[in-house]
UniProtKB/Swiss-Prot annotation:
The keyword Transferase applies. Its cofactor is Mg(2+). Its EC number is 2.7.8.13. The chain crosses the membrane at residues 5-25, 52-72, 76-96, 116-136, 145-165, 172-192, 195-212, 221-241, 244-264, 296-316. Pathway: Cell wall biogenesis; peptidoglycan biosynthesis. The gene is mraY. Belongs to the glycosyltransferase 4 family. MraY subfamily. GO terms for cellular component: plasma membrane. It catalyses: UDP-N-acetyl-alpha-D-muramoyl-L-alanyl-gamma-D-glutamyl-meso-2,6-diaminopimeloyl-D-alanyl-D-alanine + di-trans,octa-cis-undecaprenyl phosphate = di-trans,octa-cis-undecaprenyl diphospho-N-acetyl-alpha-D-muramoyl-L-alanyl-D-glutamyl-meso-2,6-diaminopimeloyl-D-alanyl-D-alanine + UMP. This is Phospho-N-acetylmuramoyl-pentapeptide-transferase. GO terms for molecular function: metal ion binding; phospho-N-acetylmuramoyl-pentapeptide-transferase activity; UDP-N-acetylmuramoyl-L-alanyl-D-glutamyl-meso-2,6-diaminopimelyl-D-alanyl-D-alanine:undecaprenyl-phosphate transferase activity. Keywords: Cell cycle, Cell division, Cell membrane, Cell shape, Cell wall biogenesis/degradation, Magnesium, Membrane, Metal-binding, Peptidoglycan synthesis, Transferase, Transmembrane, Transmembrane helix.
Length: 316
């Protein structure tokens, strides 16, 4: 099994590296450039026009590698449904942005409706195939959610998808953090002796590493919602299948911090007319506090790496 995981990581990495060399110039030719928000950090305005929808690079690499090395079973179908399904929602959003040359694609209501409907379907399949028990980290026990499982799973999926999306705001940030997160699940799959979960997680890990070659600062391409929503769908789905959704607040501490910073900022401004952060999500607060973009990114990677070890400890 470990050989399959290693080969899956290497193949997906290679596919992402090679495909990126051809796909990024093609995106430039199509003029699929990202329109940067004018109300964001001024240092980001120079990034306007950078090709977006680059998430296709690691989505395709992960999909092909998973088909090659993983058994074709219902669990792979569920993983790919979460991964590709949310990737398609993101693709639709990205396409509308670049086609109409605007910073917003799908309406928020449309995007959320699609996310919730897909989450309900995926949650039902997970419940039907792995049951309703989840593991509680640090306490070495499991809890049966019974009839509360589907609402809980829907919350986990939609919450994770949007949290990853919020994290994707700096060069290499979401890709690097998510590489570490998916590497964790690849290692968990080794302990579970589950080839399907292991190959899929390793494939996405390798694909993201290859994508980082082009997404690190200064980024040649952005993953767009195509990539960030696909990652969120993958992270949430594999966490639920392995019965480890409660590990996400620890392992995905950066995702959680980014999302909470936005929620707190909105509530504080609406209730008190004051902002807690200089700008949200959290990574922009650090930028406006004088941190260089690379320092923010590397610091968030380091926090996630520490969170990985804490997550393993919580399950030991």
């Amino acid at each position: 099994m470990i050989q399959k995981i290693i080969f899956a990581t290497l193949l997906s990495f290679t596919v992402a590296i090679i495909s990126g060399r051809f796909f990024i110039p093609y995106l430039r030719k199509l003029k699929f450039g990202q329109k940067v928000r004018e109300d964001g950090p001024k240092t980001h305005l120079k990034k306007s026009g950078t090709p977006t929808m680059g998430g296709i690079i690691f989505v395709v690499a992960t999909f092909l590698t998973s088909l090659i090395f993983s058994p074709w079973n219902k669990y792979l179908f569920i993983l790919l449904a979460g991964f590709l399904g949310y990737g398609l929602i993101g693709f639709a959003d990205d396409f509308l942005k670049v086609y109409f040359k605007r910073s917003l694609g799908l309406r928020a209501r449309e995007k959320l409706l699609a996310q919730f409907l897909l989450a309900i379907v995926i949650s039902w399949f997970i419940k039907s195939n792995v049951g309703t028990e989840i593991i509680v980290p640090f306490f070495k026990r499991s809890v049966d959610l019974a009839n509360f499982y589907i609402p809980f799973a829907v919350f986990i999926i939609v919450g994770t998808v949007n949290s990853v999306n919020l994290t994707d705001g700096l060069d290499g940030l979401a890709a690097g953090v998510s590489t570490i997160v998916m590497a964790f699940f690849a290692m968990i799959a080794l302990f579970l002796n589950d080839v399907t979960y292991g190959v899929f997680s390793a494939s996405l890990t390798g694909g993201l590493l290859g994508f980082l070659r082009y997404n690190k600062h200064p980024a040649e391409v952005f993953m767009g919602d195509t990539g960030s929503l696909a990652i969120g769908g993958a992270v949430a789905t594999v966490a639920l299948l392995t019965k480890l959704p409660l590990i996400l607040p620890v392992l995905g501490i950066i995702y959680v911090a980014e999302a909470i910073s936005v929620i707190l900022q909105v509530f504080s401004f609406k209730l008190f007319g004051k902002r807690i952060f200089k700008m949200s999500p959290l990574h922009h607060h650090f930028e406006l506090s004088g941190w260089k973009e690379e320092k923010v990114v590397y610091s968030f990677w380091l926090v996630t790496l520490i969170a990985l070890f804490v997550s393993f400890y919580s399950l030991s």
